[in-house]
Curated annotation (Swiss-Prot):
Its main location: membrane. This is Uncharacterized protein YdbL. It is found in: Cell membrane. It comes from Bacillus subtilis (strain 168). GO terms for cellular component: plasma membrane. Keywords: Cell membrane, Membrane, Transmembrane, Transmembrane helix. The chain crosses the membrane at residues 4-21, 28-47, 51-73, 80-102.
Amino acid sequence: MRNFITALPIVLLLGFSFVSFMFQFEHLVYFRLALGLFSLVGLYMIYKMKTGIRYFIIYLYASWIVLAAVTAFEEPIFSSFFFGGLVMTMGYLTYMLIYLGMKQDRDANPV
């Protein structure tokens, strides 16, 4: 059950980024591909890292900046799709930080 709870948000995020191609395919195409790839790489990094939280945080914020830049490149600023892309980017950042906190809590050595 714990693994299901851990995996559910990222599955929903990946599902949204890839399944959403069925709707409004001409908007945020590169953004959705980048979101899915950054999510997969971030998940892999979280599950494989033993130390090096600082590197993951650098990766996370760098990917957040790239996603925001891709959104600004693909959509006119202040359009509804632009704000939708920024909201999905913040969701990605939030999910990854939640996963990082869950990993830290799970891997902590009891005193």
